[in-house]
Amino acid sequence: VCSSDLDPGIEFGKLIGQDLEIFRRLDELHTLGFPILLAASRKTLVGNVLGGLPSSERLEGTAAVNTFAIARGARIIRVHDVRAMARVARMTEALIGMSVDGTPLERCRADGTIVDESELLPSGE
């Protein structure tokens, strides 16, 4: 079962600049000792930074946010596009040498159970 986490609350009562500052300082939050949960998938922040894109066109922005967050210590990422973002996470892990602290990312369901990597792959991969 996944442990307790720290969610910085992207877009909850903050301005865009404040949310961007949270992203830039995720590595500091990581030092508190809790897995960081990030939920920025398709957020308005992503759409606004990319020129007002609708949520259906925010995949690339979400991928960039998640890559940056993983590199800065986020360990739990809530997403809409699970397979695409699992691939982004896997590639990011490879680029940064698995993970910042040597542990694999936790991929959790809403009920707290950990998702098996094989569940994220299409049949035959």
PLM regions: where:
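Short, small-residue-biased leader/transition segments that mark boundaries at the very start
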Residues: 1-3
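Conserved phosphate/ATP/ADP-binding segment of small-molecule kinases
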Residues: 9
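Active-site-adjacent loop and "lid" segments of alpha/beta metabolic enzymes
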Residues: 12-125
